[in-house]
């Protein structure tokens, strides 16, 4: 993937085909689970935080943690929340302005996550990453050690790219979007599953916003060029990712032996239904 750190060689799927195998892994079987939530799920069109969805997400993840799973949350939204905080409706083009908005928004995001998770007696930790750190062995090892210690303490890491310190000189050396970041994080923390929450309920064989006959694809065994062509265009005005970046993340996770699910983030019960084996979203098993 252009600009993304290389997968951990120890976790690639060498020797395994694209279809199910006797050792096939599903997201529902994961003990360590990475959940990625996007800006369009966390905020309204005006950029303000969707407190209901955010509270539902924190309650659901807290309950899954109580049930014995270990959770890592990759959260977009710093720039979008910063826009809402400062009353901006249009995402700026200038790198410096986006960095400033990320600095404002990240504070607000972590305040809310600390508040909502704290209501269910869970502690969160902020982890801000840059690609140049995790793409070198020493930096990668340090990040892996941090995740291991946080998870062993029962802490829920909340991860984002450190947009504030990314500069033009580092362009091409960044993650590019938080879908990619979530797949990288899944490899770093030894996850057995990646769940990407988005504003539609999976991958469709057409654009469901334009084609009422478009059908959801419940399961994708191999991410072929034909499958990638279904992903369409860019993301929302408030975020950087669209379905194409989510497919790339699923592909990167698959290369590390990690199954992925792309599901709607609109309802708090959807992760429960997914992990109980119900037919929701689109699954990418390994």
Model-derived features: positions:
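Intrinsic, low-complexity polybasic segments
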Residues: 2-8, 16
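C-terminal catalytic "cap/lid" subdomain
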Residues: 8-11, 20-286
């Amino acid at each position: 993937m252009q600009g993304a750190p290389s997968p951990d060689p120890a976790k690639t799927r060498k020797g395994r085909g694209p279809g199910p195998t006797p050792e096939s892994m599903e997201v529902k079987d994961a003990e360590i689970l990475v959940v990625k939530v996007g800006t369009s799920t966390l905020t309204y069109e005006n950029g303000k935080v969707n407190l209901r969805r955010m509270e539902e997400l924190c309650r659901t993840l807290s309950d899954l943690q109580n049930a014995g799973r270990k959770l890592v949350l990759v959260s977009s939204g710093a720039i979008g929340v910063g826009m809402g905080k400062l009353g901006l409706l249009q995402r700026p083009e200038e790198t410096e302005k986006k960095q400033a908005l990320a600095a404002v928004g990240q504070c607000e995001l972590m305040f809310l996550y600390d508040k909502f998770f704290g209501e269910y007696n869970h502690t969160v930790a902020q982890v801000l990453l840059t690609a140049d750190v995790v793409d070198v062995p020493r930096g990668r090892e340090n990040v892996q050690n941090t995740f291991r210690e946080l998870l062993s303490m029962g802490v829920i890491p909340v991860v984002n790219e450190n947009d504030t310190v990314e500069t033009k000189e580092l362009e091409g050396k960044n993650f590019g979007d938080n879908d990619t970041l979530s797949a990288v994080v899944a490899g770093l923390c030894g996850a057995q599953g990646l769940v990407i929450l988005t504003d539609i309920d999976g991958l469709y064989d057409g654009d469901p916003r334009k084609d009422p006959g478009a059908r959801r694809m419940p399961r994708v065994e191999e991410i072929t060029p034909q499958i990638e062509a279904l992903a369409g265009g860019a993301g929302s005005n408030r975020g950087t990712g669209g379905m194409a970046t989510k497919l790339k993340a699923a592909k990167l996770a698959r290369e590390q032996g990690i199954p992925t699910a792309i599901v709607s983030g609109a309802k708090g019960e959807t992760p429960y239904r997914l992990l109980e084996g119900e037919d929701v979203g689109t699954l990418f098993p390994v």
